[in-house]
Amino acid sequence: DELNKKVDSDETISDDGVVAHGASMDEKHDYMDNGVRHVHNGRTRRKGSEHEVDGRFTPMEARLVFHLTTPPCTESVLWVVQKDDDEHHTRREEGPHWHDTHSFKHAEDLDVHLTPEDDLEDDKRHDDTYTYEGSLTTEEVQVEGYKDEPEELEMVDNWRPAQKNKVTVYKASEH
């Protein structure tokens, strides 16, 4: 579900009552060191959920792996690995909308790590392979992150007209 309604500083809630808790995505992170976030989300009043975070029961857990390009660009690629009703769902989200509109905080259980693999297909440019080793409630899963499109070069508009050499122009002050 699209989370689009901010409740307070540590949770985000959608129109149908799904709440997400996790780490802050309001700042730029380094790709290898800080590019993974562990988020719990679900209906806060639902008892018997698989997770309890800060006294709240949450039925779904998600792992977000994102890549922020060179600052000041905020374009990101997110891999979402979540467990709901004993099934794994993997979804890829691209674009700056997650980075700009979501605020997740208080996630310390960052147990997803990046594992580069050498035997991936050579005809695609891969960023890395993301491996989650599993927990008591979630089986291990591995997702290969690919980008089919080439990296775009940013052009800077720094053109200016030719300047005259050794010429100083003085203008009279009106005051």
Curated annotation (Swiss-Prot):
Family matches, as SUPFAM superfamilies: Carbonic anhydrase
EC number: 4.2.1.1
Binding site for substrate: T137, T138
PTM comment, free text: Glycosylated.
Chain positions covered by the region annotation Disordered: 1-52, 85-104, 115-175
Biased segments, Basic residues type: 37-46
Keywords: Glycoprotein, Lyase, Metal-binding, Zinc
Residues given in the record as Zn(2+) binding sites: H38, H40
Activity regulation (record text): Inhibited by diamox.
Expression sites by tissue: Sclerites.
Basic and acidic residues bias locations: 24-36, 115-129
GO molecular function: carbonate dehydratase activity; metal ion binding
Chemical reaction(s) catalysed: hydrogencarbonate + H(+) = CO2 + H2O
Role according to the record: Reversible hydration of carbon dioxide. Also acts as a structural protein, having a role in calcium carbonate crystal formation in the bio-calcification process.
Similarity comment text for this entry: Belongs to the alpha-carbonic anhydrase family.
Descriptive protein name: Carbonic anhydrase
